[in-house]
Amino acid sequence: EDGSDAVSGEFLAEGGGVR
């Protein structure tokens, strides 16, 4: 997790998963 739920959500939407 990057620390921000919003960031994780964006990555998940892109298909990159949690970074």
Swiss-Prot record:
It comes from the Eukaryota. Keywords: Adaptive immunity, Blood coagulation, Coiled coil, Disulfide bond, Hemostasis, Immunity, Innate immunity, Secreted. Conversion of fibrinogen to fibrin is triggered by thrombin, which cleaves fibrinopeptides A and B from alpha and beta chains, and thus exposes the N-terminal polymerization sites responsible for the formation of the soft clot. The soft clot is converted into the hard clot by factor XIIIA which catalyzes the epsilon-(gamma-glutamyl)lysine cross-linking between gamma chains (stronger) and between alpha chains (weaker) of different monomers. Changing S8G: In strain: Italian bred. GO terms for cellular component: extracellular region. One of its GO terms (biological process) is blood coagulation. It is found in: Secreted. Heterohexamer; disulfide linked. Contains 2 sets of 3 non-identical chains (alpha, beta and gamma). The 2 heterotrimers are in head to head conformation with the N-termini in a small central domain. A long coiled coil structure formed by 3 polypeptide chains connects the central nodule to the C-terminal domains (distal nodules). The long C-terminal ends of the alpha chains fold back, contributing a fourth strand to the coiled coil structure. Cleaved by the protease thrombin to yield monomers which, together with fibrinogen beta (FGB) and fibrinogen gamma (FGG), polymerize to form an insoluble fibrin matrix. Fibrin has a major function in hemostasis as one of the primary components of blood clots. In addition, functions during the early stages of wound repair to stabilize the lesion and guide cell migration during re-epithelialization. Was originally thought to be essential for platelet aggregation, based on in vitro studies using anticoagulated blood. This is Fibrinogen alpha chain. The gene is FGA.
